[in-house]
Structures are given as structure tokens and as C-alpha cells.
């Protein structure tokens, strides 16, 4: 596997820490040892997160093309767009963000606080669009890029989650290589890696990276899209492309992509009772915060799988904490009593 042939622009602090979740593990019976890899602490750029790791491989391409404006898209409370805005500010570039109405959540401050507030503070041109949720290429995003061209700028396209970008899977191939180096220091290997999946390139990169040592199907995606067929297909397609460009040496098969679809409801961006219980449990036992859109759902999935005995006794499970905490203030009404 040859990740090193791709240029990388450093936006993160370095390898993210692996933290044992001792109290949560004990609360769940102690037979499975839970750990978290803290991608939510990976950068000093506006809280960082998993997209910042991905952007390290997109930014060299943007600079090589002479782009002056990063153009990205997401929902109103998109973590992706906040991270793109931060990187643009850091590099002295312009930033246009398309924020679509992906979540059916009615709150008068939803589009004024959290991620979107931070993006505005960092100088991004934020454009609210009424279109609903979809993980594919969006008309509104293409129109935003054309508007930059018409104004004499040179846009660089960064799709939702970086996922439809040809280099979007590379960052989390690097994540797998980083985990292997940390495992050598820890003296053990993780039996499973749990990760939230929506647009797909985070899990896709992990699948390719862990395929290098035979653990592709030990990456357990927890769907948060509530459109699992689309998400599974997109993970598989991105993983196959990424495997080719990093010269993995084997094809990614359907069985390499594991996506648990039980925890996404009621729909994208809205938590269920299990999501909320997982958020509160992790916060109160570990002081680790997760959000109701992504990490609360993957935390719910991991906790439930432990309770159901779906991880063998003695297993060591690594939870990939991808970020998302800045969105919590947009859901303040849900958590008004903690």
C-alpha cells in the first residue's frame, strides 16, 4: 500500500490519542474493553474533526490548481462546512458554504448557533438553501461554484463529507496506519473499530487501511443516514476507488463493508431514545461528549452491541470519535435539563 505518494498538508496536531473508556466498559459488564480514538481533538482549527484529517489530502490539490475559494456543502449544522471554513481562514482563502435543510428539526435558533455560527465568525459566505437531505452531488453546490467563477474567482469543489472527491478516502487510510503504529506501542490489536457512516469516505478509508492487515470487515459502520442502501453503495464505491489509487493489491468486496442499520432512526439528524441515552451515559461516565446527529448514534450502536453480546468476551473495541460537539447548542431544547 502506497499512501506516501500523495502530498499531505498538515492541519492536525499529529496522531490522535487513544483513550480507554474504563468506566463505560465497567458499566456495561467489563467483558469488553472500550477505547476511543479522539478525532474530535485532532486540530486547533475550530475544534477539528474527521473532515480535517481528510482535508489534509485535498488541500495540496487545491493549492496546485491555484484555487482561491473553497466551496463546500452540508446541512445547516454541518461539521464539514465548519471545518472547511476553518481551513480556508487558516490558509487565507475565501470560502463559500451551501447549507441545505437536511434535518427536520424546528427550532428558532437552529440556523444561528453551533457549526453555522462558527462558520460565519470565520468569514465564510454562508448560503442557506431549502433543499432536503441527500448524500450525492447537489445542484445547489454546483450553482455555488458557478457563481464563484462568474465573479472571477477560482473555486475548489469539496463535496459533502469530502466523500465524492477522488482523494476523499485517503485521510482514513492514514487513520488505519496510525492505529497500527499505536497498537505496536500498546502491545495489542483492536478486534473491532466502530465508526459512524453517512456520506461514506471515513468508513471507506478505514476499510482500505485495515484491509492491509486483514481487518476490513472488523470496521463496523453505524449508519446515521437512514438511507442505508445509498450509504453502503457509496462506501463500497469509494473504498474500491481508494484501494486502487493507494495500490492496496486486492479488490474490496461487498463483505468487506459492514454497515449496521439499526441505530439511524427516526431519520437523519434526529435522535431516538437510544441515541439520547448513549449521549448522556457517555457524558456522565466518561466526560466525553457526543452529538445527536452522528456520534450519539454510533455510541448508541457500540453500547447496544456490547449489551447484546455481539462483541466476544475479551474483545477490545476502538470507537472512532469523529467530532460533532459544536452542533450540541443547536439541540439545546432537547438537553435543557441535561
Swiss-Prot record:
GO terms for molecular function: 1-aminocyclopropane-1-carboxylate deaminase activity; D-cysteine desulfhydrase activity; pyridoxal phosphate binding. Its cofactor is pyridoxal 5'-phosphate. Its EC number is 3.5.99.7. The modification N6-(pyridoxal phosphate)lysine is found at residue 51. It catalyses: 1-aminocyclopropane-1-carboxylate + H2O = 2-oxobutanoate + NH4(+). It holds the Pfam family PALP. The keyword Ion transport does not apply. Keywords: Hydrolase, Pyridoxal phosphate. GO terms for biological process: 1-aminocyclopropane-1-carboxylate metabolic process; amine catabolic process. Catalyzes a cyclopropane ring-opening reaction, the irreversible conversion of 1-aminocyclopropane-1-carboxylate (ACC) to ammonia and alpha-ketobutyrate. Allows growth on ACC as a nitrogen source. PANTHER family: 1-AMINOCYCLOPROPANE-1-CARBOXYLATE DEAMINASE-RELATED. This is 1-aminocyclopropane-1-carboxylate deaminase. The gene is acdS.
Amino acid at each position: 500500500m502506497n499512501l506516501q505518494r500523495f502530498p499531505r498538508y498538515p492541519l492536525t496536531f499529529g496522531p490522535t490519542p487513544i483513550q480507554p473508556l474504563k468506566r463505560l466498559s465497567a458499566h456495561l459488564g467489563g467483558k469488553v474493553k472500550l477505547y476511543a480514538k479522539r478525532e474530535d481533538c485532532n486540530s486547533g482549527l475550530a475544534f477539528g474533526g474527521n473532515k480535517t484529517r481528510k482535508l489534509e489530502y485535498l488541500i495540496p490539490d487545491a493549492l496546485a490548481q491555484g484555487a482561491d475559494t473553497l466551496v463546500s456543502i452540508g446541512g445547516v449544522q454541518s461539521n464539514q462546512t465548519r471545518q472547511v471554513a476553518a481551513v480556508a481562514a487558516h490558509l487565507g482563502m475565501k470560502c463559500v458554504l451551501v447549507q441545505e435543510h437536511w434535518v427536520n428539526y424546528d427550532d428558532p435558533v437552529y440556523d444561528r448557533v453551533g457549526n453555522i455560527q462558527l462558520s460565519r465568525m470565520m468569514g465564510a459566505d454562508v448560503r442557506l438553501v431549502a433543499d432536503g437531505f441527500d448524500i450525492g452531488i447537489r445542484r445547489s453546490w454546483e450553482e455555488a461554484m458557478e457563481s464563484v467563477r462568474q465573479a472571477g474567482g477560482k473555486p475548489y469543489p469539496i463535496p459533502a463529507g469530502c466523500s465524492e472527491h477522488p482523494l476523499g478516502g485517503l485521510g482514513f487510510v492514514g487513520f488505519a496506519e496510525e492505529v497500527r503504529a499505536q497498537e505496536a506501542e500498546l502491545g495489542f490489536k483492536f478486534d473491532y473499530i466502530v465508526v459512524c457512516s453517512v456520506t461514506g469516505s471515513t468508513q471507506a478509508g478505514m476499510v482500505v487501511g485495515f484491509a492491509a492487515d486483514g481487518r476490513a470487515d472488523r470496521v463496523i459502520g453505524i449508519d446515521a443516514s437512514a438511507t442505508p442502501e445509498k450509504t453502503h453503495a457509496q462506501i463500497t464505491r469509494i473504498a474500491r476507488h481508494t484501494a486502487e489509487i493507494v495500490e492496496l493489491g486486492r479488490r474490496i468486496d461487498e463483505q468487506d463493508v459492514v454497515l449496521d442499520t439499526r441505530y439511524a432512526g427516526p431519520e437523519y439528524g434526529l435522535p431516538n431514545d437510544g441515541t439520547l441515552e448513549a449521549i448522556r451515559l457517555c457524558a456522565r461516565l466518561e466526560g466525553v461528549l457526543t452529538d445527536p446527529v452522528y456520534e450519539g448514534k454510533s455510541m448508541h450502536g457500540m453500547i447496544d452491541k456490547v449489551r447484546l453480546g455481539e462483541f466476544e468476551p475479551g474483545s477490545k473495541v476502538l470507537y472512532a470519535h469523529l467530532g460533532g460537539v459544536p452542533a450540541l447548542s443547536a439541540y439545546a431544547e432537547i438537553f435543557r435539563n441535561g
